[in-house]
Each structure stands twice: as structure tokens, then as C-alpha cells.
């Protein structure tokens, strides 16, 4: 007696497996990345329901046509005023799901292949400026003896030394820092749960040692740069403290007053200063946590 072929999984079952099994368990993506994928799907499913007149539970893979995807992307830009970067990020989430679905439902390969043909939208990346060494040192400044001043000094030194993203810096715990003179470094936890170790300069080592002497209650699991409640600093607080430091630095470097200095500009400054010092681009890519030197270029 011939065995009956197993029916292909339903669209809702595929979506559930994509989030529960693929993203969370198999790829072990960070909660923030999974949340970005979830938001993209919520928007897409809401758009599909309005356009097709069917609830998400009634959708099938053949419903996910290039026309539907293109209409959704146009809706994001036109009606929701999403940037091209956000539009492409949401398309990437859909493409990731479709590639996953192709392994679970081979009967829909042709449909999926057509849908995967929707291209990302090209856009001009704005040229990002950077600070001179004099300007960067002025922003870092000299701590005035207060707790906040000393913490902010370490924060700004760490941002410049490591070229790290804000999320990586505020996530650093005391135990992530190695202060041995011969092999001083900080272990950063980056995007997609990737980890890397970045060497620490002597000035950074001295500042961290002074900070830890001032804060003996900090243990290996404590945030290196806490707020007054002992919790990790927020992104907003980092932006606020950087803005304050730039205002103070503008007294000695007046040109800073007219510039918007962001943590990402400091990251770019780190890359440019390393490049000017003769460091190879491939090393700078590892320093910044780029997957490819092409990104660093």
C-alpha cells in the first residue's frame, strides 16, 4: 500500500516555525533582531490582509507574489515614510522567511523563486565626517573629579579606542575587560551575538583602572559604565552625555559647535585615525566588527 504524501505546511505554520525554530533556536539571533523581523512581518501581514481581504491565517505561499511585495514596499515609503534603508531591511526579513520556506515546502519553489526576485532599492549613502585628533581629544576631555565626569571620560575613551557601537559599549561588564599590560583588551558583544576582542590603549587602561578604584562595589557581572542606579546606561543617556562633552569641547575647538557629533561619527573617527596610522583595512574591519572589509571601505 502506497504511503500518502505528507501535505505541505500551512503559511501560519511556516511563519511560526521561522520565528520559533529558525531565528531563535537555529540562528540564535538576538532578541532585538528577532523583534525587527517580527515588526516587519506584522506590517506585511496587515498590508496583505487589507489588500487581499484575507486574514493572515488564510494566506498561502502563492499569495506572496512579487506584485504584493512591491506594493508593500511602496506603501512603506509612501504612506509610512520609511527610509530606503528601513524598506530594504524589511524586504530582507521577507526574503529570509522565503528562503526558509523553500526548504520546508518544495512544492512552492517556483512561487518562492519569483518572490525572491524583488530587488533591494539602491540609495546613495551620505558621506560621514570624522573628527581630527585634536577635536577628538577635546571631546574626551579631562575628568573634573566628579563621579559623572570620570564615568563619561571612560565612556568617551572607550568609544574612541574601540570604535564600538553604543549597544556594545553599554553592554560591557567589568568581567569583559582585561587590564594586563601585555594583553589588555575588552570583549565586545556585537550584532547577532557576535563577539570580538579589541586591544586597549594605555590611556584607556589608566582611565579604567582609576574608575574601578573609585567604584570598588562593581563586580565582574556589573556594567562597567553604570548609571547612578547601578544599571547599564541607555542609548539616550550616552547621546546626552556626548552632546554635553561636545558643548564643553567647543570652547577650545569652536568648529565643533556647528557640527552634529554622533557615536557613529566617533566610530568613523576611530577607523580613519587607524587608517592614517597605517593600519591595514582588514585589521580595521576586525576592530570595528565588520563582516567584510568592503563595509569598512
Sequence positions of predicted segments:
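Conserved catalytic core of the tyrosine transesterase superfamily
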Residues: 1-297
Amino acid at each position: 500500500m502506497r504511503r500518502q504524501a505528507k501535505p505541505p505546511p500551512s503559511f501560519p505554520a511556516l511563519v511560526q516555525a521561522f520565528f520559533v525554530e529558525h531565528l531563535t533556536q537555529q540562528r540564535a539571533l538576538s532578541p532585538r533582531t528577532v523583534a525587527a523581523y517580527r515588526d516587519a512581518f506584522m506590517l506585511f501581514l496587515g498590508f496583505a490582509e487589507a489588500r487581499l481581504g484575507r486574514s493572515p491565517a488564510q494566506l498561502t505561499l502563492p499569495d506572496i507574489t512579487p506584485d504584493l511585495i512591491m506594493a508593500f514596499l511602496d506603501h512603506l515609503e509612501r504612506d509610512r515614510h520609511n527610509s530606503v534603508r528601513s524598506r530594504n531591511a524589511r524586504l530582507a526579513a521577507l526574503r529570509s522567511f522565503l528562503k526558509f520556506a523553500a526548504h520546508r515546502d518544495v512544492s512552492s519553489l517556483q512561487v518562492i523563486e519569483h518572490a525572491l526576485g524583488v530587488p533591494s532599492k539602491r540609495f546613495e549613502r551620505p558621506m560621514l565626517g570624522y573628527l581630527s585628533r585634536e577635536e577628538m581629544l577635546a571631546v574626551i576631555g579631562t575628568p573634573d573629579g566628579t563621579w559623572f565626569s570620570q564615568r563619561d571620560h571612560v565612556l568617551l575613551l572607550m568609544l574612541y579606542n574601540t570604535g564600538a557601537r553604543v549597544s556594545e559599549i553599554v553592554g560591557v561588564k567589568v568581567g569583559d575587560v582585561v587590564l594586563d599590560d601585555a594583553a589588555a583588551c575588552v570583549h565586545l558583544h556585537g550584532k547577532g551575538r557576535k563577539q570580538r576582542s579589541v586591544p586597549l590603549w594605555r590611556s584607556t587602561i589608566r582611565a579604567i583602572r582609576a574608575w574601578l578604584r573609585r567604584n570598588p562595589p562593581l563586580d565582574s557581572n556589573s556594567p562597567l559604565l553604570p548609571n547612578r542606579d547601578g544599571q547599564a546606561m541607555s542609548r539616550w543617556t550616552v547621546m546626552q552625555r556626548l552632546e554635553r562633552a561636545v558643548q564643553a569641547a567647543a570652547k577650545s575647538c569652536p568648529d565643533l559647535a556647528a557640527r552634529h557629533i554622533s557615536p557613529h561619527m566617533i566610530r568613523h573617527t576611530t577607523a580613519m585615525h587607524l587608517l592614517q596610522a597605517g593600519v591595514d583595512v582588514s585589521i580595521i574591519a576586525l576592530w570595528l566588527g565588520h563582516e567584510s572589509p568592503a563595509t569598512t571601505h
